């Protein structure tokens, strides 16, 4: 009985929040946090990211080991530079409304109003692509009216009538601030997205907030950082930071419903049906059945499940049993069959 099944989850209404994107009710099921130091050198050009702390909470923690879910979200939430001529999003290149080569021919601009944005008087400049089916944004530019004509804020929306694979709607908001030496720098970046895991199923909502602070234009011993191999470095203690660390170092507090995620997960795990759903989803996504409840302990997994049962006209129904060892048995040698 559907009503009897849903009654087991009636406590969920206490954890509902409202989407900042479209105002619809949402349930926070995953929170990921990352605290990093970003280094940039203009000449020779180099970029390095040192991850000081990172953690992941939510139902997807058991479903994802940095694979499909993580890689897809990272592709969506790549930081952009509004001042570049082209902005890459999901393997597509969008013309920037500030492009020095195409902006004035690619977009139509409309002065909407003058208003205060974070203490700066700005002109509200709307823009739309000249061709509604092209890879351009709709949105707003807020330009300061103090004589410098700096970009204070920008809103970018992807048009509804273009194909972005499994993404339905995407919005990017950036705000800039002026430093004491008059330099303008990126202050905050918000990305909102509605997307599907499977087309035709319930949409998912994701929101990423990036906060930029503690700018330093005279970094000591920067050569030692740029001498590191690779662009990304995760400190050994990054994933082991306690709650107290996040409380003191998180630049913006979690929202009430985000902070209540641990309580929500505790309630959900008391419902046997939820655990069965998660276990089934884990098997479907990974293709393997672990021989232990904890992924950090299991030494052998059965699978892949998509080849366990098969049938054809010549051989009829067939069943095979297979599996493979994990890094918990030996991190260097693996066996499968």
Residue ranges and their predicted role:
Residues 1-124, 128-136, 194, 198-310:
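Structured extracytoplasmic
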Residues 118-126, 150-155, 183-188, 331-335:
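Short, hydrophobic/aromatic-rich segments at coil-to-beta transitions
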Residues 127, 155-159, 300-311, 321-322, ...:
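Transmembrane beta-strand segments that form the barrel wall of outer-membrane beta-barrel proteins
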Residues 133-145:
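Mid-length scaffold segments of soluble, non-membrane domains
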Residues 146, 179-181, 328-330:
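Outer-membrane beta-barrel channels and translocator barrels
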Residues 158-159, 164-209:
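Short aromatic loop motif centered on NTY/YTY
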Residues 170, 315-319:
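Residues that define the transmembrane beta-barrel architecture of outer-membrane proteins
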């Amino acid at each position: 009985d559907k009503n009897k099944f849903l009654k087991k989850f009636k406590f969920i209404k206490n954890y509902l929040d409202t989407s900042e994107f479209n105002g619809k009710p949402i349930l926070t099921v995953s929170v990921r946090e990352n605290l990093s130091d970003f280094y940039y050198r203009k000449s020779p050009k180099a970029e390095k990211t040192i991850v000081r702390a990172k953690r992941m909470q939510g139902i997807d923690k058991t479903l994802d080991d940095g694979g499909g879910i993580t890689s897809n979200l990272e592709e969506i939430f790549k930081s952009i530079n509004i001042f570049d001529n082209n902005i890459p999003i999901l393997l597509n290149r969008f013309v920037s409304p500030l492009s020095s080569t195409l902006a004035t021919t690619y977009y139509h601009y409309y002065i909407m109003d003058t208003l205060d944005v974070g203490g700066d008087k700005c002109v509200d400049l709307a823009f739309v692509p000249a061709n509604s089916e092209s890879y351009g944004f709709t949105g707003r530019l807020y330009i300061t009216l103090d004589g410098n004509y700096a970009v204070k804020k920008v809103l970018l929306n992807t048009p509804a009538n273009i194909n972005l694979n499994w993404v339905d709607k995407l919005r990017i908001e950036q705000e800039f601030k002026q430093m004491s030496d008059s330099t303008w720098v990126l202050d905050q970046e918000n990305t909102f997205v509605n997307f599907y895991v499977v087309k035709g199923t319930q949409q998912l909502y994701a929101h990423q907030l990036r906060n930029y602070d503690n700018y330093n234009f005279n970094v000591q011993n920067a050569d030692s950082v740029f001498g590191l191999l690779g662009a990304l470095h995760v400190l050994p203690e990054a994933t082991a930071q306690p709650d107290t660390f996040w409380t003191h170092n998180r630049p913006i507090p979690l929202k009430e419903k985000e902070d209540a995620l641990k309580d929500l997960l505790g309630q959900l795990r008391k419902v046997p049906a939820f655990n069965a759903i998660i276990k089934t989803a884990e098997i479907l996504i990974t293709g393997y059945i672990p021989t232990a409840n904890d992924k950090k302990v299991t030494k052998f997994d059965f699978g892949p499940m998509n080849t366990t049962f098969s049938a054809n006209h010549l051989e009829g129904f067939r069943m095979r049993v297979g599996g493979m060892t994990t890094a918990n048995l030996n991190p260097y040698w693996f066996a499968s069959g």
